């Protein structure tokens, strides 16, 4: 046992083999240092219990002395094989961190939950280890969890898909090429396939056929026209018109020189059938003339209806070309102009004479 002289009248026992025996030089070289800690100017005597019942010369802060006392008490309980109280096991924040000593006052009941109502009430439950609150009040200080923000709403389909995310896969349209067999136009079938469209009730493929009844009607007319072209080509080698069994002229044997078109227009043929009585109109008088004094005999009409008797240039050339083959009929009452059957005659010339005869009759009356 060595004795350390503090003053002339006081002697303090000092144990060199103590658990906390440190000399002053070792403390200066420790991590604490003298700059960061509040150091007592004089050695502070510390009275402990049991093995630590001795006085220490070395300077410690108040927080360090309290922590040493707590550890000494825990050690004493462990040696005596007694359960350590909960208050000793939980270290207060003030003792753990000396820097918070000035801001936080020491808790009188460190093992008790620190949840209060701000006045006198305080929770009586024990705190959770390494926390300040009990299990009930442990998460009260944290902000409440907010509800998860959902993405922008997109209306789902009946099939579970989304209208917003819709894939349109375009397919090339298929068009069947038209084929001509034996110089005849066959009905052309046009099939267009609409792209793979996914509507609100599911994905379906629609196929639209462009062949309708109206188009079939036009195609049938084209077939008739092609037959007429074929028959006119066969008849072009002969100069005599082809007549049917009942004595009427064939529809496709009537052709005019209309700028390279060997087929008479539908409107012109209708005028001949309706007004002039070419094909069996039954309106001829006893002189053999049709309405408006125009002859309707089949022999005379065949002279300008034949394919080889047409004049080049069409109706416009016939009007501009001077002609001296006009003969006035002997019938004074009708004053009808009739044309002798010459190769230069045409329906346009007949129509011109028809209008002149009508004007003469109106002036006579």
UniProtKB/Swiss-Prot annotation:
A motif (Bipartite nuclear localization signal) lies at residues 112-122, 140-147. GO terms for biological process: DNA-templated transcription; leaf development; regulation of DNA-templated transcription; response to far red light; response to red light. Residues 137-147 have a biased composition (Basic residues). Residues 337-365 have a biased composition (Polar residues). Pfam families: QLQ, WRC. One of its GO terms (molecular function) is ATP binding. Induction: microRNA 396 (miR396a or miR396b) negatively regulates growth-regulating factors (GRF1-4 and GRF7-9). Keywords: Activator, Nucleus, Transcription, Transcription regulation. Its main location: nucleus. It comes from the Eukaryota. Residues 107-151 form the WRC domain. Residues 137-187, 332-365 are annotated as: Disordered. Transcription activator that plays a role in the regulation of cell expansion in leaf and cotyledons tissues. Component of a network formed by miR396, the GRFs and their interacting factors (GIFs) acting in the regulation of meristem function, at least partially through the control of cell proliferation. The QLQ domain and WRC domain may be involved in protein-protein interaction and DNA-binding, respectively. This is Growth-regulating factor 7. It comes from Arabidopsis thaliana. The lineage of its organism: Eukaryota, Viridiplantae, Streptophyta, Embryophyta, Tracheophyta.
